[in-house]
Structures are given as structure tokens and as C-alpha cells.
Amino acid sequence: MKLTCVMIVAVLFLTAWTFVTADDPRDGPDTAVGWRKLFSEARDEMKNREASKLNERGCIEDKKYCGILPFANSGVCCSYLCIFVCVPKAP
């Protein structure tokens, strides 16, 4: 019973938090204050991928260890093919 009440309160809190932090498209980024300004800047960074700091990371060179699980097109290797080591692209 207590766990159910806690879960209901948590869901209501998270729902309210979603509505409070939602960005109003009628407001421009210059009128945003506090948390709204922070969320607006984060959303603008996702729209403009060149502004993202995640794009600044480098890639792993060919024949270097890239991970345990083999995933094709993982983006970790410069050649985009990782099978325990970065595999160079076929000519």
C-alpha cells in the first residue's frame, strides 16, 4: 500500500515537472529565464549539431582496440566498422 502511494506521488510529481519545464514556443529565447533558458539552449544545441560539444571528440584509428561488442557503424572508429579492433574500409 505504501509503495503504491509512493509510486503514484512520484508519477504525479514527474508529470507536473514535465509541464513546468516545458518550453512555450510563443516565448523567444531572449525572454527565457532560469531553467527555461537552460532548456532552450540545450534544445538549440540539438537543432544545430555543429554547436554540440560532442562532435569535437575524435575517432579511433584503424587496427586499434574499439570495444568488446562488435557493432557495425558504431561511430567510434574512423572507418565506422568495429569488430574488436577498427577495421579499415575495403578499397
UniProtKB/Swiss-Prot annotation:
Keywords of this entry: Disulfide bond, Knottin, Neurotoxin, Secreted, Signal, Toxin
Propeptide: 23-57
InterPro entries according to UniProt: Conotoxin
Major place of residence: secreted
Domain of life according to the entry: Eukaryota
Keyword Protease: no
Subcellular location(s) of the protein: Secreted
Signal peptide interval: 1-22
One Pfam family it belongs to: Conotoxin
Disulfide bonds: 59-78, 66-82, 77-86
GO cellular component: extracellular region
GO terms of molecular function: ion channel inhibitor activity; toxin activity
Organs and tissues of expression: Expressed by the venom duct.
Annotated family: Belongs to the conotoxin O1 superfamily.
Domain notes from UniProt: The presence of a 'disulfide through disulfide knot' structurally defines this protein as a knottin. The cysteine framework is VI/VII (C-C-CC-C-C).
Listed name of the protein: Conotoxin VnMKLT1-021
Source organism (scientific name): Conus ventricosus (Mediterranean cone)
